[in-house]
A protein has these predicted regions:
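Extended acidic low-complexity intrinsically disordered regions
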Residues: 1-10
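A short beta-strand micro-motif
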Residues: 11-15
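Short, surface-exposed, charged amphipathic helix/loop patches that serve as local interaction elements
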Residues: 8, 18-96
């Protein structure tokens, strides 16, 4: 019997002002336990590295207004808001 990869859900988040129009698609299921450990580590560097693993796509900008090719090039305030919005969105998902 061969294994198949489950179809995991994602959530769409929209950041708060002053990041109007900034959105991201983020993993809501199938997230490795290590990502949760890193988010709760108390280390900003480890938490941000974990955040990067959650983001599937985004339209974030750098501090000079250019598209951020790497989510970690976006302003810290935007990334903090993204983590909060992701947590709220995942908690609000109905059970399967």
């Amino acid at each position: 019997m061969s294994q198949s990869k489950p179809q995991f859900r994602t959530v769409e988040i929209t950041l708060s002002a002053p990041f109007d129009g900034w959105t991201a698609t983020m993993k809501a299921e199938g997230v490795p336990a290590r990502v949760f450990i890193e988010l709760q580590s108390g280390s900003a560097e480890r938490a941000l590295t974990a955040l990067k693993r959650l983001v599937v796509k985004h339209n974030f900008l750098t501090d000079d207004g250019a598209p951020a090719s790497d989510v970690l090039d976006a302003p810290m305030d935007a990334l903090s808001d993204a983590i909060t919005k992701w947590s709220d969105a995942v908690a609000a998902l109905p059970p399967r």
